[in-house]
């Protein structure tokens, strides 16, 4: 049953609130992370409830899941918001929603736990609001990378003066792509192009390889993750360090470029782990989000398996800050055990990776990236 304290708010009313008293209004967007990241109302926050969290909550969701930002949650509990407005894609009546939908769970939690704030849902959702009030919305089209010349001839700071456009591998074409405003993904070639990095405002690089050089150590901050693109490699033990590094650069106002040799497997894995942890999303959602920006990403079987294990830890209600360094990792450093994952089901095997070509995988993986 819908809580009667929740009323519909027309788009024109929200527009007036944002124009006059935006600091008194908390907007909670209940759409998927992918939809929210592509376009959203200015100043809104995304409510992300995983299937695991929903199932374990049994209809009674804690406020910490609805408003993960601690500062906003404290302001809400203290009654400092006049209005809390929830929205999804296009709902016009709350009675149309399932009881276990993200917005209904959020409505019930807010009506139960908020203090002194009126709870509303936006009539017509983001679809209607963006059509009527586009000036209060942000829209981020999937970046396609830089349109810079492929040849590094005569480019100051270039590490390679002999490249030619002819025969340039696909993974080196174009430029680094924006995953988030402070996070970029690309190849070792891109990492050797100081002009590209400077154009993007890059201040730090994560080098996810054991043999790619750090070309400009006097100019950029570097973080090295010496992992081979191998089914025996343990990349998950580096997730926490990489995530902390990205966050530290972000918090200082900088931008991070993550690369391996081709920008397909190892560096993509790090970006996926970052999205999963910081946005509490499933692997398939993070994968689709990154693939929209760099279509050739293809983490190897083992890395996909480690990401799946990471997903179960990230989305568990009791997950801790140590989730990126599990007590029992998929592959222990230094061991020779091989585990191949037929996404999304893990299959431990004892034969060599080369003998497993018969395994079919809906997500193409690359043997060497």
Curated annotation (Swiss-Prot):
Summarize tissue expression.
Answer: Expressed in XIK-2 kidney cells.
Q: What induces its synthesis?
A: By serum stimulation, heat shock and oxidative stress.
Cysteines engaged in disulfide bonds, as pairs:
none
Q: How is it modified after translation?
A: Phosphorylated by MAPK1/ERK2 at Thr-168 and at one or more serine residues in a progesterone-dependent manner. Phosphorylation reduces its rate of degradation but does not seem to affect phosphatase activity.
Residues annotated as domain Tyrosine-protein phosphatase:
175-316
GO CC terms for this protein?
cytoplasm; nucleus
Q: Does the keyword Magnesium apply?
A: no
**Rhodanese domain location:** 21-138
- Record-listed E.C. numbers: 3.1.3.16, 3.1.3.48
List locations, semicolon-separated.
Nucleus
Q: Which InterPro entries match?
A: Atypical_DUSP_subfamB, Dual-sp_phosphatase_cat-dom, MKP, Prot-tyrosine_phosphatase-like, Rhodanese-like_dom, Rhodanese-like_dom_sf, Tyr_Pase_AS, Tyr_Pase_cat
- PTM annotation (Phosphothreonine): residues: 168
Outcome reported for the amino acid change (mutating residue 168 to V): Abolishes threonine phosphorylation. No effect on phosphatase activity and MAPK1 binding
| A GO MF label | phosphoprotein phosphatase activity
Q: Which reaction does it catalyse?
A: O-phospho-L-seryl-[protein] + H2O = L-seryl-[protein] + phosphate; O-phospho-L-threonyl-[protein] + H2O = L-threonyl-[protein] + phosphate; O-phospho-L-tyrosyl-[protein] + H2O = L-tyrosyl-[protein] + phosphate
Alphabetized UniProt keyword annotations: Hydrolase, Meiosis, Nucleus, Phosphoprotein, Protein phosphatase, Stress response
Q: Which CDD domains match?
A: DSP_DUSP1, DSP_MapKP
What does the function comment of this entry state?
Dual specificity phosphatase that dephosphorylates MAP kinase MAPK1/ERK2 on both 'Thr-188' and 'Tyr-190', regulating its activity during the meiotic cell cycle.
Q: What is this protein called?
A: Dual specificity protein phosphatase 1-A
User: From what organism does this protein derive?
Assistant: Xenopus laevis
């Amino acid at each position: 049953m819908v809580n009667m304290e929740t009323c519909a708010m027309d788009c024109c009313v929200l527009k007036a609130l944002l124009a006059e008293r935006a600091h008194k209004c908390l907007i909670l967007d209940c759409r998927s992370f992918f939809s929210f990241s592509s376009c959203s109302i200015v100043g809104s926050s995304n409510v992300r409830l995983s299937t695991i969290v929903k199932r374990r909550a049994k209809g009674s969701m804690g406020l910490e899941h609805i408003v993960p930002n601690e500062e906003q949650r404290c302001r809400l509990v203290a009654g400092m918001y006049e209005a809390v407005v929830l929205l999804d894609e296009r709902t016009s009546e709350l009675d149309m929603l399932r009881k276990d939908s993200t917005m209904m769970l959020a409505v019930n939690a807010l009506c139960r736990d908020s203090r002194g704030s009126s709870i509303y849902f936006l009539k017509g959702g983001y679809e209607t609001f963006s059509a009527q009030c586009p000036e209060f919305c942000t829209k981020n089209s999937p970046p396609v990378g830089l349109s810079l010349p492929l040849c590094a001839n005569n480019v100051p700071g270039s590490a390679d003066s002999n490249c030619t456009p002819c025969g340039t591998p696909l993974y080196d074409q174009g430029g680094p792509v924006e995953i988030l405003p402070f996070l970029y993904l690309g190849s070792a070639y891109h990492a050797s192009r100081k002009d590209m990095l400077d154009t993007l405002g890059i201040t730090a690089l994560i080098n996810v390889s054991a043999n790619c050089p750090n070309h400009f150590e006097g100019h950029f901050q570097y973080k090295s993750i010496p992992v081979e693109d191998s089914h025996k490699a343990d990349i998950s033990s580096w997730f926490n360090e990489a995530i902390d590094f990205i966050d530290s650069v972000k918090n200082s106002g900088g931008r991070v470029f993550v690369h391996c040799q081709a920008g397909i497997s190892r560096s993509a894995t790090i970006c996926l782990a970052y999205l999963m942890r910081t946005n509490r999303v499933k692997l398939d959602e993070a994968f689709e989000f990154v693939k929209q920006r760099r279509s050739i990403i293809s983490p190897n079987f083992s890395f996909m398996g480690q990401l799946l294990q990471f997903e179960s830890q990230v989305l568990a209600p009791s997950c801790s800050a140590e989730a990126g360094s599990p007590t029992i990792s998929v592959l222990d450093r230094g061991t020779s055990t091989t585990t191949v994952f037929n996404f999304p089901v893990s299959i431990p095997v004892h034969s060599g990776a080369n003998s497993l070509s018969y395994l079919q995988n809906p997500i193409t993986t690359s043997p060497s990236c």
